[in-house]
């Protein structure tokens, strides 16, 4: 564990702190021990400390990364970012992508996807708490450990492509509910979800407006809600979001391979023209550009070792399928579905890389089996 932990900390933590943190074996034994394994000596206390650090981190970080949100209109978006990226799904995905799972002591409790997610989330928060406690204890400076933990989280989130758009921050189920609330008088009813077996059907006044199949109820609901939103939009029913449409892209070059997006709230965000990855942001174009990392990041295709999304699309078209694959993103995890059924997952901080990695894994499977 010491080698893994040292490598994990090396990117974000000053050299002098690393042995202080890694050397606290008493804390790390707790970090990876849930209450179900040891009711008296587990991660619960550290988890509370880590949760407090995360609660401070998110609003502070997002206001620094997106200065345009430092306004009355931006408060709602900051709150939503905090909810979305501080969720169980987000923290568990981060912990999983960093390799936490192999160290967690699950004990006699059966592990299913839900308990696995909870264990990963709790452990990540306990990890932050352990960093705080180790540094504070060594230097007898209250709060110094929180500064170190903040830097770790900042480096994790700096590598994420974070969108401020309404459709990225709110899932389809939430957006459909909001549409129903706003347009209730026009639509004359509520969207009703009917779950039977592996199928979810959404009806509005008895009319089917969305349908999806698959093993995971939550994913089915999101896919069916997406169909419902598309259908209602085609029929002229959609919610106008002047206040929520935070980013409005103004196409145009702003340096080598970069595009500037102007916010409705007055700031600017710089994206990679091809990758779509957020490279920098600020109150002015100059400030946003000054924060762009100088080194070129590998593209999603380069990370995956090929354009597997295109290869998979060509393969499916050759067997008579079009538009049968969807990508459902939760935090740093993507679930690929084919005809509504989950077929592959991948973890990565960058959305396009996640999709290429999932496509690669599934392409290799179907190409080998010919299914």
Curated annotation (Swiss-Prot):
Keywords: Endonuclease, Hydrolase, Nuclease, RNA-binding. Residues 10-136 form the RNase III domain. One of its GO terms (molecular function) is RNA binding. One of its GO terms (biological process) is RNA processing. Disulfide bonds: none annotated. InterPro entries: RNase_III_dom (IPR000999), RNase_III_sf (IPR036389). The keyword S-adenosyl-L-methionine does not apply. It catalyses: Endonucleolytic cleavage to 5'-phosphomonoester. Coiled coil: none annotated. This is Putative ribonuclease 3. The lineage of its organism: Viruses, Varidnaviria, Bamfordvirae, Nucleocytoviricota, Megaviricetes.
């Amino acid at each position: 564990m010491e080698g893994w932990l040292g490598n994990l900390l090396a990117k974000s933590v000053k050299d002098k702190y690393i042995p202080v943190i890694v050397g606290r074996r008493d804390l790390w034994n707790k970090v990876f021990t849930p209450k179900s394994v040891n009711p008296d000596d587990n991660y619960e206390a550290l988890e509370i400390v880590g949760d407090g650090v995360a609660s401070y981190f998110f609003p502070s970080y997002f206001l620094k990364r997106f200065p345009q949100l430092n306004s009355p209109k931006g408060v709602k978006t900051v709150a939503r970012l905090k909810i979305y990226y501080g969720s169980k799904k987000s923290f568990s995905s981060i912990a999983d992508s960093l390799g936490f799972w192999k160290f967690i002591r699950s004990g006699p409790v059966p592990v299913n996807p839900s308990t696995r997610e909870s264990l990963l989330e709790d452990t990540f928060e306990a990890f932050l708490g352990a960093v705080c406690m180790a540094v504070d204890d060594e230097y007898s400076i209250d709060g110094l450990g929180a500064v170190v933990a903040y830097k770790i989280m900042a480096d994790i989130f700096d590598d994420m492509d974070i969108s401020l758009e309404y459709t990225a921050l709110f899932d389809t189920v939430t957006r459909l509910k909001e549409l129903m609330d706003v347009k209730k008088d026009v639509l004359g009813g509520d969207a009703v979800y009917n779950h039977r077996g592996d199928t979810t059907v959404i009806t509005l006044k008895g009319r089917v407006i969305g349908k999806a199949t698959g093993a995971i109820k939550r994913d089915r609901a999101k896919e069916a809600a997406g169909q419902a939103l598309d259908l209602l939009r085609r029929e002229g029913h959609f919610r106008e979001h002047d206040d929520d449409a935070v980013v409005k892209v103004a196409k145009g070059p702003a340096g080598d391979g970069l595009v500037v997006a102007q916010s409705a709230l007055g700031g600017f965000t710089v994206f990679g023209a091809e990758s779509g990855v957020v490279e920098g942001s600020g109150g002015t174009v100059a400030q946003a550009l000054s924060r762009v990392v100088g080194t070129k990041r590998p593209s999603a295709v380069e990370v995956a070792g090929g354009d597997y999304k295109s290869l998979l699309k060509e393969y499916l078209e050759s067997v008579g399928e079009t538009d049968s694959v969807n990508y459902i993103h939760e935090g740093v995890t993507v679930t690929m579905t084919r005809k509504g059924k989950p077929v592959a997952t991948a973890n990565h901080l960058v959305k396009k890389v996640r999709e290429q990695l999932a496509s690669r894994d599934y392409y290799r499977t179907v190409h080998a089996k010919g299914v």
